[in-house]
Regions:
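Short, charged/polar "capping" segments at the starts of alpha-helices
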Residues: 55-56, 89-95, 155-158
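A nucleotide-sugar donor-handling region in carbohydrate enzymes
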Residues: 1-62, 175-187, 191
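C-terminal amphipathic helix plus adjacent low-complexity
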Residues: 156-208
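Catalytic donor nucleotide-activated moiety binding site of glycosyltransferases and closely related
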Residues: 78-111
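Short hydrophobic signal-anchor/transmembrane segments that target glycosyltransferases
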Residues: 62-77
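A donor-sugar binding/catalytic signature common to diverse glycosyltransferases
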Residues: 117-159
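Conserved active-site histidine-acidic residue motif and adjacent donor-binding/catalytic loop
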Residues: 110-118
Length: 208
């Protein structure tokens, strides 16, 4: 259970990030499975874009700012961009993003065909993530790459606790309009929870 939920109960394992399947082994296996992606010009920032929910609001201006920032990154340093949207991403905003990035080497997930999400994470040099999605932030952190956070309007105390903890650990930073390189410590929450559950299962077998 993530610490920011503050559900302290016997038998509950507290984690900083969400438990997720974006392991280093899975990302490595997916990384070069798709030749067309593997040959895209580098550097490759990947943008994980969501949308409005009951806590956060993704205003149209934020879509413009994200597209402008990504285009600026490509203009200054070249490379490619990989875009992942969610079910909450506004279709108009996503279309605008694609239009503004149309002159660059881009690829985006639209929910059709094979899911390339883990390939995108594995190939990215930097993973920009919308701050309203704990799971996406946690999966991006599993890459060990820099994870700048795209701030949205809104939020609450629970999300604030999560982001403060991730920044304090050196895992994420606020996105400031440019790509910064830093050493991103990979959270060990998934391994730690898996090991604890394994020990618990072994204990039950011995008592049976």
């Amino acid at each position: 259970m993530p610490k920011h939920d503050r559900l302290h109960r016997p038998g509950v394992i507290a984690t900083r990030a969400a438990v997720h399947p974006a392991t280093q082994a899975r990302l490595a296996a997916k990384r070069y499975r798709f030749p067309a992606l593997a040959t895209m010009p580098r550097p490759i920032p990947s943008g994980l874009i969501s949308g409005s929910n009951r806590i956060y609001r993704s205003a149209p201006r934020r879509g413009d700012e994200i597209a402008e920032a990504l285009a600026g990154i490509l203009c200054r340093g070249g490379g490619s961009v990989l875009i992942t949207s969610s079910r909450r991403t506004h279709a108009a905003g996503l279309a605008l993003l694609r239009e503004q990035l149309g002159g660059f080497s881009t690829a985006s997930l639209d929910g059709s065909g094979e899911n390339l999400y883990f390939a995108y994470l594995g190939l990215a040099d930097t993973v920009l993530v919308a701050g309203d999605y704990v799971a996406m932030v946690s999966e991006a952190a599993g890459t060990g790459k820099p994870v700048p956070i795209l701030n949205l309007d809104g939020g609450n105390a629970k999300f604030a606790r999560f982001h403060v903890a991730m920044r304090a650990a050196g895992i994420t930073r606020p996105f400031c309009g440019r790509i910064e390189g830093w050493s991103d410590p990979v959270p060990d929450d998934t391994k730690r929870v898996g090991a604890a559950l394994h020990l618990f299962a072994l204990g039950r077998r011995k008592r049976a």
